[in-house]
From Swiss-Prot:
Signal sequence coordinates: none
InterPro entries cross-referenced by the UniProt entry: Kinase-like_dom_sf (IPR011009), Prot_kinase_dom (IPR000719), Ser/Thr_kinase_AS (IPR008271)
Enzyme class: transferase
Protein name, UniProt field: Protein kinase ORF14
Residues of the Protein kinase domain: 109-391
Catalytic reaction list: L-seryl-[protein] + ATP = O-phospho-L-seryl-[protein] + ADP + H(+); L-threonyl-[protein] + ATP = O-phospho-L-threonyl-[protein] + ADP + H(+)
Claim: Kinase is one of the keywords in the record: yes
Length: 391
């Protein structure tokens, strides 16, 4: 009788129930097979650096990797091009990871890492087939409202996922106690996007005006939905948005600076204490009106400003090419300068003649309104969703 197939994550991948139960790891390592070649979808990997996969992972893993076929892979080089990370996971690194965090490897094959604490690889638990395991210190942190023992970061992330504004947080844990909080850690295991971030994606891929406007309208709508739930991301930037496919949608990641509408938060380790939650996550994205004292969060007008910067990153690759220190480099001639940079960098697909150029000019004008120095002059989030949708 054929094995029963069940979806492992929201219907993207279907695996036999036996595979979900048994997992990917071997009960005991085996000797490496000299003829083994790691195959992931259409790509047979030439490097031998990942031969350890055969030693530690069973046929459930290698068969699933071989059969992967997400729609965003158009050619074999996409398999590893889309996978983030700066260094390959070798066997020694894998064994260290397995010793400390082996439960996360049940259905996860880590192949790359960054700084030895962020691991990227493949998992059927992710809708994209790619997943990320992140390990970080957690000696500070805030608590979710009315949810003792749950970090605000997790609460915001799970709420955003419910609103389709964030990738799935598959598993998480906080280790440590109040007494040893300086050595406490948070571990998150979640879905991973293409190239790791929107910044990485649009550094390599060219967008059409349609894709750009659609992504920005969708992102703005998701931020508005989160605010209506009383959640502010706190570190809005291109690096904290991932692309789940070639045309979007964009989804928010890294909620460690998330906060509520007020200026005070409850301490995670000392729930009876509150403190002022002041920081802007990334100074380069701070709006010009941000004060230096308490209440430094961006607020809604500040979020509109940050959306404008994200839009510039899509349009010209790096916002600093046209906009620095809250000011257009070319002053009132910014429209022509932005278009010149777009043409020079090839970051937007300008095919379509005069109609496309008119739409680009309309997009530049809307972004300029987001970047007004006076917060009162910026459009509301509701208006922004509507106007991005009309471009």
């Amino acid at each position: 009788m054929a094995e029963k197939l069940i979806p492992s994550c929201r219907g993207q991948w279907f695996l036999p129930a036996r595979v979900l139960r048994e997992g990917f790891l071997r009960a005991r390592p085996v000797a490496v097979d000299g003829g083994f070649k790691l195959t992931i979808g259409p790509l047979t990997v030439a490097t031998r650096v990942w031969d350890w996969v055969y030693v530690h992972y069973n046929e459930n893993a290698t068969d699933w990797l071989r059969g992967m076929n997400p729609p965003f892979w158009e050619e074999p080089c996409d398999v590893l091009d889309f996978l983030p990370g700066v260094a390959c996971v070798n066997e020694a690194t894998f064994l260290t990871l397995k010793k400390k965090y082996g439960s996360y490897l049940h259905l996860f094959v880590p192949l790359r890492h960054t700084r030895g604490n962020i691991f990227f690889g493949f998992s059927p638990l992710s809708a994209t087939g790619m997943a990320v395991l992140k390990i970080k210190t957690f000696h500070g942190g805030t608590q979710a409202p009315d949810r003792p023992g749950v970090p605000m970061e997790v609460y915001a992330w799970e709420t955003a996922h419910f609103l389709d504004a964030a990738p799935k947080l598959i598993e998480w844990e906080v280790s440590g106690t109040r007494e040893n909080r300086k050595s406490a850690q948070m571990v998150t295991f979640s879905e991973c996007g293409l190239y790791g971030s929107m910044e990485g994606y649009f550094y390599r891929e060219r967008a059409t005006v349609d894709i750009c406007a659609t992504i920005l309208a969708d992102l703005t709508g998701k931020l508005l939905a989160l605010i209506r739930k009383g959640i502010y991301h706190g570190d809005l930037k291109s690096e904290n948005i991932i692309m789940m496919s070639r045309s979007g949608p964009g989804k928010l990641i890294d909620f460690e600076h998330s906060h509520g509408p007020g200026e005070t938060m409850t301490s995670f380790w000392y729930p009876d204490r509150t403190f002022f939650w002041n920081p802007i996550g990334t100074e380069a994205y701070a709006p010009p009106e941000r004060s230096r004292g308490r209440g430094r969060n961006a607020g809604v007008p500040g979020i509109v400003f940050q959306i404008g910067l994200i839009a510039l990153n899509i349009m010209v690759e790096r916002m600093e090419r046209v906009f620095v220190n809250h000011t257009w480099i070319k002053g009132d001639g910014y429209r022509a300068h932005v278009l010149k940079v777009i043409k020079a960098r090839g970051t937007l697909d300008l095919r379509g003649g005069a109609r496309t150029l008119a739409r680009v000019d309309e997009l530049i004008g809307l972004v300029a309104r987001c970047l007004e120095r006076d917060p009162a002059m910026r459009p509301s989030l509701e208006t922004l969703v509507d106007e991005f949708s009309k471009i």
